[in-house]
């Protein structure tokens, strides 16, 4: 027996008689694996033989009990030198295996633990009855059983199962006989009951029919059993089992209907021990109705069988019974008026840290009867808008705050400096070693110092101090100091006095002096000794300011850089001497480089203006007290993100002081300076700091628990003492003390979500900094930070006594809430910028263009429409929005680009007249370009003016122009015309940056900001976090649990960004802080634009937001115009050749078989996708109006599939008559006879998917009105299926652009293909594209096969789209040339007759910068070698090799020397 093993046996008090057995003779511990995060220890033992079963059980039980006392889980396995396979020992251990997880599941244990085992032919044989599922045993249980028996010491085992015929017959016989006995008894009981009943009944003439089986009674009994059944925790289910009952919450639901019409609901539940997948089939309508109770958030009791799902291969419950149950939520049980106010709560806008939404925080506080609740996210206020709206709705006061990162503006190098010559001074360079970082809870164990003059050590001080208790392993490992060093050490007070004498008349010096000085002063104070008053130099800050270019300024890195000896880092005497040597290097450099000679100069002349970047961050909570404070808060957030950002947003103290009006300050958490001072400097220092604040925060002891693990506080009693000290600080500083919860999630069981999110940050994050070193290092546990009720908080602080606890938890928090005024976070009105004479300009431009097109006087229909729109636009202050959009479009037009409109702006005729959109929303009409005569078709018989037959003006004979899409103005600004206009514009991607700068130019840079966005953790990303957490922390979750955890961890703020085209314009008579703070996107301080801090959607009804989006269509049109010289405005919308594309391929000169599709839609915007091409094939559109229908149908949700598609297939409706775009509903219903207001309301309900969500009474009212006006039932039913609809104006703008592109495909094909490949194609494979039709078709077939097998990559999918167009181009007789080193462009394809020459960027792996460099280099001279191409052209060796393989380089030699050699010989 080894000494180590013997010591372990002593610790667990293993009985001596068992230790003396022969198996223990050579016992040893082979290895111990310590899993620090899970606190699991794995022992691997060696024994001479397999232990007797009684000895094994004793060893097992004593190990478990002993380590449980230290909160450590233990497992162990055994390697036995000799193995005894005797039947008795085998049978005993076989049965023992079923007492250990995972073999101890109820079903496995009951079925297999009693079976007989023997050892034959080097195999363990299990005899089982023949009806046992051997396959199930082998697949699901055998591996676990083998593993457990091997852990007992039986070595590598082979196990087999045989059928025991005798057992089978015996069990079968017993089963049959017992069943017969039961049946016989049931029959006998029934006969006796019948006889008794007959004796009681009067005689009857007719025979009574035989009693029927009472199914209802059976169901009732089953239900009663279900109600009383034992609930099984989900975590315990590991194998297939029957009649299991769960209780839990539904978190995912999916309904399906099979092809045969059967209904199934798949759902997932959690009981917070684990989660499970469940499914239920509906056998009849009653079962189907039960599906309605299975919804997200509902708590259910379910019973069913656990089976392995053949598709997912995971355990799934097939539900037999289900019942909704009441889940008892936590409640705040304190009486009204005696409830606390939570003043420190983080929402999911605290980056990668908190889980609860601001809505759930406010709703819960309101539900609990709290009068107010505060929001204090980390360094941001992005939850303010939602919190503001939710609080108003919930009838509770929201207190708006944040937890800020406060730093000192300038961190001094010297404390208490005096006028002294640095080079004539005497220095005491000292260092202390301690048992931890807390001066109040940890002890000094060494003080060492070197007294130095002019760089020489003149005297040294080195004393150990016995703390009165053994040192922890961590302290010994860190410092190298052991208990032996401390034996015989002097008392602390003696050492302190001696050190004070040693330091007289000297400047004190330390590395990170704030710690050492703070520790010394706390100990001086504790022993009534004077604190340090002489000057102190901090060499850490000295180095940071003197050598800002260095990344690390710790003692270790600095001594290495300056070659100063440091043999035993973290022993005070060595550290002190090394610090002293560094000091004189610093003094010399400071004198020579900066002229620093006097101690006073260190702070005045050397401390950098941006030293705040390196300053230690301290947390503080800042609260908005009134409206002035809100604006100051916005300014502080902005400054911290824009001017003072360094790793995190920082607020220098002087900046906070300058903006403190209307704000209240709290001391925050354990990272606040007051809490830190209590720990490290003492109560007196903490009181001085506390005077800066408005109140002192204390938190539940559970929140401070990680400080115990980090050895900053000794134990629970130490935490309670710190809280008492904080209360004492408040008393002395005359500041109220408030108990806050530091909330990060709502419910206790949600702790795991935060754990997953925080641990995903990795060890680089401060919150994950490890405790200990090596394999045993682990991050500190996270505190229990759920939202606590008043009762729970009072329980947390019960150690203070009832009265004091009530004061800090309830009274003081309520008093603070009463000091907070209601503020307006989000404005109630729209504030547009001011443009001089905007109203007059919009009206003037509108009438000017209208007169030009329609004549003066205007037709009544035009005049009335303009008057209606201008009344709304000018009356609601929207003119500036229209004018700004017009100015931007006009500027882009002047640069040669068309601008496409998006959304519903095309519903506004004023927008059309002033040039914002090309879409004309008037009813279809003719208008003469010569005499302005017009004809309008207002009966709804024509869907689009472009579909009117060509016609000449009856007055002057000039061919009419055709226009009008029949779109009501109400779809843009609402029925009353007061909805804030959202004008979205598609600029060319090439011109988008210029358009953005136009906004700055028009409104001023200080008023234009990019629209900010907040990026949150997506569920797929959260899934990855969960899997990573499993891997890193030794967890295993079943699939349903992974899904739950991923859903729970999703939605947390991860980063910020900017809308791709959104720009917010602040009115020039206000400033941005009236609406939102500002910041840089994704904390990129080099970004050229600042963004709104708030998500732009939160303020889009208060300020002007311009959507200046980049789009390929305008770029494509510009390219085609440049190639052809054709003005796209002149392209007709009813070109016959273009319309022919939608019905066949003949117009392209190819057959459908050649290009693989029956129409010519490939590469046409809006219509080129597989989905829309399929729609075209089914509907065969022939008019512009029908194309609008297709556009609407393809962009809507539940508009085509399962709706219009079926109506058209069944001949009930046509493409023309189905509901396609949202506006069609209003127009159709008005033509049918409904009042405009009702028609508008119906349209709004349908387009937003609300038709089935409104009250039945409201919906029936609409249906009755429609039926009264002969609206067909199919139309009404179609309305009920729609979830989302596309605006007709948007469709019209897109279709118009698409037809212009299609025009070039038909009439100028080589130009079309050149533009397509230059602008739209996403992937290229030049070798294939230049290889001819066979190569292209073969590659397409290859990708098609991969697609069928789900093996195609995203790049291959993009390439397939490109190859479809290449194939079409080649089939039409055009050619695809090879890349040419001297002719190819960098970026764009070029036309050479009937051939396209690809650009360099089309070569896989060659980027835009290299492409441009090659073109530039070739202009400077021919490439004489591959080496020169690499050097001057910037091409990598791989790219040059690829070019060579493709024949692009010809016979180019490897280097120039070979060329010279060839020239001479």
Swiss-Prot record:
It holds the Pfam family DNA_pol3_a_NII. GO terms for molecular function: 3'-5' exonuclease activity; DNA binding; DNA-directed DNA polymerase activity. Its main location: cytoplasm. GO terms for cellular component: cytoplasm. It catalyses: DNA(n) + a 2'-deoxyribonucleoside 5'-triphosphate = DNA(n+1) + diphosphate. It is found in: Cytoplasm. InterPro entries: DNA_pol3_alpha_NTPase_dom, DNA_pol3_finger, DNA_PolC-like_N_II, DNA_PolC-type_N_I, DnaE2/DnaE/PolC, DNAPol_HHH, DnaQ, Exonuclease_RNaseT/DNA_pol3. Keywords: Cytoplasm, DNA replication, DNA-directed DNA polymerase, Exonuclease, Hydrolase, Nuclease, Nucleotidyltransferase, Transferase. Its EC number is 2.7.7.7. One of its GO terms (biological process) is DNA-templated DNA replication. Residues 427-583 form the Exonuclease domain. Belongs to the DNA polymerase type-C family. PolC subfamily. Required for replicative DNA synthesis. This DNA polymerase also exhibits 3' to 5' exonuclease activity. NCBIfam families: dnaq, polC_Gram_pos, PRK00448.1. This is DNA polymerase III polC-type. It comes from Streptococcus pyogenes serotype M3 (strain ATCC BAA-595 / MGAS315). The lineage of its organism: Bacteria, Bacillati, Bacillota, Bacilli, Lactobacillales. The gene is polC.
